[in-house]
Amino acid sequence: MTGPDTHAVKQFLLALQTNICAELEQLDGEASFKAESWQRAEGGGGTSRVLTQGKLFEQAGVNFSHVKGAAMPASATAHRPELAGRSFEAMGVSLVIHPNNPYIPTTHANVRFFIASKEGADPVWWFGGGFDLTPYYPFKEDVLSWHQTAADLCAPFGEEVYPKYKKWCDDYFFLPHRNETRGVGGLFFDDLNQAGFEQSFAFMRAVGEGFIQAYAPIVERRKALSFGEHERQFQLYRRGRYVEFNLVYDRGTLFGLQTGGRTESILMSMPPLVRWEYGFTPAAGSVEAELYEVYLKPQDWLQQA
């Protein structure tokens, strides 16, 4: 198995952050990202880039981090207890975009690389990541194009890759207490190292670069749609699910908090405005009801193309 080239991974991640920010600024057309670099006392640091109050994007955050620590946190060893006590090095790019327009979906993407080391033993390394889409007023055309882009980028790596990581995404971004998915899914992968470093790194690059190819056309299709206070209030209500998932279930959020990461960067994924409403149910036959009845249930979208 080829050894890991951490320098190459870091350079790719830094370039990816820059490229995605440039693409999002071009889409928005008005606002620009503000960058803030930070250091972590235990080792490492990162750069957070945040765009706020744009023409299209209420808030978009694209974060790069490269952190080191003497002992793996509980969130990283829960499903791999054999790694407990190892030192670690983690780097990645994570982003969340909260649009103004309820017809443009919220989205999240992440690509990351992890090494766990112990004296006298070979390092254990792996890649992870993915991207997912959270519409408020879904259009089937958008969901299909999103999944088609995901399937196309997976295809060179094997026909089993897209179905496997699509299902993993559906399973991961699920809120048990609501019995619904967070959105319409996408891709999610972790512990990727079986094919060796070069092939695993190539897949991570494909996912990172494929994200904006999947998201930008959806933004372009929906950015001119007009909306009113009713749609805005439903968007704010549904954003509550994002908060619930990230604070209760998300491994990345828990990892950041447990390793003493930069809180502002970790919670950058939170929407700037959100609301809860006791006992809310959408009106029967409404487009809001269709979200619950059709879209928040895992399904084979590409069969419907």
Curated annotation (Swiss-Prot):
Gene Ontology MF annotations: coproporphyrinogen oxidase activity; metal ion binding; protein homodimerization activity
InterPro entries on file: Coprogen_oxidase_aer, Coprogen_oxidase_aer_sf, Coprogen_oxidase_CS
EC code: 1.3.3.3
BP term (GO), one: protoporphyrinogen IX biosynthetic process
Top-rank lineage group of the source organism: Bacteria
Keywords carried by this UniProt record: Cytoplasm, Heme biosynthesis, Metal-binding, Oxidoreductase, Porphyrin biosynthesis
CC terms in the record's Gene Ontology section: cytoplasm
Protein residues bound to a divalent metal cation: H98, H108, H147, H177
Active site: H108
Positions annotated to bind substrate: S94, N110, V111, R112, G260, G261, R262
Catalytic activities: coproporphyrinogen III + O2 + 2 H(+) = protoporphyrinogen IX + 2 CO2 + 2 H2O
Top-level EC class: oxidoreductase
Region span, Important for dimerization: 242-277
Cofactor needs: a divalent metal cation
This protein's record includes keyword Ligase: no
Site (described: Important for dimerization): H177
Subcellular location: Cytoplasm
Record pathway: Porphyrin-containing compound metabolism; protoporphyrin-IX biosynthesis; protoporphyrinogen-IX from coproporphyrinogen-III (O2 route): step 1/1
PROSITE patterns in the record: COPROGEN_OXIDASE (PS01021)
UniProt similarity note: Belongs to the aerobic coproporphyrinogen-III oxidase family.
NCBIfam families recorded: PRK05330.1 (NF003727)
Subunit record text: Homodimer.
Function: Involved in the heme biosynthesis. Catalyzes the aerobic oxidative decarboxylation of propionate groups of rings A and B of coproporphyrinogen-III to yield the vinyl groups in protoporphyrinogen-IX.
Protein name as annotated: Oxygen-dependent coproporphyrinogen-III oxidase
Organism: Shewanella denitrificans (strain OS217 / ATCC BAA-1090 / DSM 15013)
